């Protein structure tokens, strides 16, 4: 009986020691991952994306460079409305981040006097429309822009998510 007690005690000490050794010898670093995997941005803005715990070089790329571009340091630039994926590639694995850019179907608009164009919001719904100068161009609640007289102005829209997006409007002088 006494022999069994010593054996159990010895076994318990060995298990506890082994468990402590495992805890302290393991790395405390987390797994490699992107700082974000889903991002919603407004056209014209930028944001830094990070690949955490990455070892070695990281190669960044965009699935659609017309919507979102990315530089070699992981800074992403929202160019126009749409959806694209940013990829961060290491030697071992590729990581993806979905980027949704809220914007208009046109970022700049040139309209002749009395002409109309319908601006459409991509990846959101319009809540309220504004014209920077109603003497140059007006906008309806449906996003229809009408050129009034020559000049430059900005048409803005507040989306349902609270984002403000803008379109520059130019109405040229008509030469007779």
PLM regions and their residue ranges:
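Extracytoplasmic soluble-region selector
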Residues: 2-4, 8, 23-176
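Bacterial N-terminal signal peptides
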Residues: 12-23
């Amino acid at each position: 009986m006494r022999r069994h007690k010593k054996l159990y005690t010895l076994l318990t000490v060995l298990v506890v020691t082994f468990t402590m050794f495992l805890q302290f010898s393991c790395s405390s670093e987390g797994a490699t991952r992107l700082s974000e995997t889903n991002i919603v941005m407004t056209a014209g803005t930028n944001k830094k994306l990070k690949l955490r715990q990455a070892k070695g070089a990281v190669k960044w790329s965009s699935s659609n460079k017309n919507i979102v571009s990315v530089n070699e340091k992981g800074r992403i630039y929202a160019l126009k409305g749409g959806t694209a994926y940013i990829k961060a590639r290491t030697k071992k694995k590729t990581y993806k981040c979905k980027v949704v850019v809220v914007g208009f179907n046109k970022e700049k608009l040139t309209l002749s006097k009395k002409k109309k164009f319908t601006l459409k919001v991509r990846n959101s719904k319009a809540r309220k429309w504004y014209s920077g100068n109603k003497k140059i161009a007006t906008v309806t609640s449906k996003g229809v822009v009408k050129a009034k007289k020559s000049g430059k102005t900005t048409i803005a829209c507040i989306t349902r998510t609270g984002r403000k997006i803008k379109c520059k409007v130019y109405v040229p002088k008509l030469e007779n």
